[in-house]
Swiss-Prot record:
Keyword 4Fe-4S in annotation: no
Annotated family: Belongs to the metallo-beta-lactamase superfamily.
Protein name as annotated: N-acyl homoserine lactonase AiiB
Keywords: Hydrolase, Metal-binding, Plasmid, Zinc
Cofactor: Zn(2+)
Protein residues bound to Zn(2+) 1: 111, 113, 191, 213
Coiled coil: none
């Protein structure tokens, strides 16, 4: 049996377009006043069913991220609110596939921001793969009580409340096979302190390269490549986008971007089918 890839729709986040494409709008002497544009970007996760493993790439936002008692700080809720019906949260999307978090053997976390690692706490029996530098960054925000970033202190507190099977990828480990046709890629620093991708080969088509926020959209990808508005390391980001292009083109893989509205709308969602 070959690999199957399910695309999980986990709702949307409403953001200033400049967060996604840097300098999307800017003032000039000729146009001293320019209005920014709000856009709704998809939040997603990907489930890969293999012969001997069930792998999840990212976990979306926590179901209780919003509201007066929500996980996210008030400023985060104002700046980039989450929008999603109850059926869009990750545990519910898994239930729709007759799965529970306990059925997931491995969770690959592209990075540990609020819209990608919000549901980590539900996976007490899974191996959790994260970049060692990204893990250290998240724990530092938790330890210092710093609520100013996309690393959510209340989420991290829940992760660390009980022992978990963390598998941290070192800086020098570039690639690792997780299952036949499924390879973990270490993109290193860029959008965040440590980004991980996933290459998934399929039987009926070449497959996909899942890159998450290492490259938000096709516009960021180019060519010419354009930087995102939220970056930890600009040089690392540029290097990563070039590496993604070389890796995908040399293997005929389709790049699935982190928050591309048009691309995501075109994909078959888990409620309607899968890729194989």
């Amino acid at each position: 049996m070959g690999n199957k890839l399910f695309v999980l729709d986990l709702g949307e986040i409403r953001v200033d377009e400049n967060f996604i494409i840097a300098n999307s709008t800017f003032v000039t002497p000729q146009k001293p006043t320019v209005s920014s544009r709000l856009i709704d970007i998809p939040v997603s996760a990907y489930l890969i069913q293999c012969t001997n493993a069930t792998i999840l790439y990212d976990t979306g936002c926590h179901p209780e991220c919003m509201g007066t008692n929500g996980r996210w700080p008030a400023q985060s809720q104002l700046n980039a609110p989450y929008i999603g019906a109850s059926e869009c949260n990750l545990p519910e999307r898994l239930r729709q596939l007759d799965l529970s978090p306990d059925d997931i053997s491995t969770v690959v976390l592209s990075h540990l921001h609020n819209d990608h690692a919000g549901c980590v706490e539900f996976f007490g029996k899974s191996r959790l793969i994260a970049h060692e530098d990204e893990f250290a960054t998240a724990v530092r925000y938790f330890a210092t009580g710093d609520h100013s970033s996309p690393y959510i202190v209340k989420d991290i507190e829940a992760w660390l409340a009980t022992p978990r099977n963390w598998d941290l990828v070192g800086r020098d480990e570039r690639e690792r096979e997780l299952a036949p046709g499924v390879n973990l890629l270490n993109f290193g620093t860029g959008h965040a302190s440590g980004m991980l991708g996933l290459a998934v080969r399929l039987e009926k088509q070449p497959g996909f390269l899942l890159v998450s926020d290492a490259c938000y959209t096709a516009t960021n990808y180019g060519p010419p490549a354009r930087r995102a508005g939220v970056l930890h390391d600009t040089i690392g980001y540029d290097r990563t986008v070039s590496h993604i292009r070389q890796y995908a083109e040399s293997r005929s893989l389709t790049v699935l971007f982190g928050h591309d509205r048009e691309q995501f709308a075109s994909l078959i969602k888990s409620t309607d089918g899968f890729y194989e």
